[in-house]
């Protein structure tokens, strides 16, 4: 496993990507736990998940957890208008 704490300051974002690297396929599953107790829609910072036939937008509400396969779903963090906090982790396979 691998985990980190992320703080996106106002004006931050993260471009569309996969969590599994081209040269390292050890990340099997991704998990994001949101830590934003006072989040409101105007705060932005939603997770945008690109499914094969539709796009899903997930609000970073406190206590909400998102879990997905690291090599299948591209995703991005939309522009934040307020600080956005989360713990992100990856369940890994192999050595």
PLM feature spans:
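Catalytic core of non-heme Fe(II) oxygenases with the double-stranded beta-helix
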Residues: 1-95
């Amino acid at each position: 496993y691998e985990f980190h704490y992320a703080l996106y300051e106002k004006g931050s974002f993260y471009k569309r990507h996969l969590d599994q690297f081209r040269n390292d396929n050890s990340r099997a599953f991704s998990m994001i736990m949101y830590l934003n107790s006072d989040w409101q829609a105007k705060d932005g910072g939603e997770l945008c998940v690109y499914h094969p036939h539709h796009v899903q937008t997930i609000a970073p509400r406190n206590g909400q957890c998102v879990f997905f396969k690291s090599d299948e779903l591209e995703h991005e963090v939309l522009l934040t208008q307020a600080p956005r906090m989360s713990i992100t982790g990856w369940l890994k396979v192999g050595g």
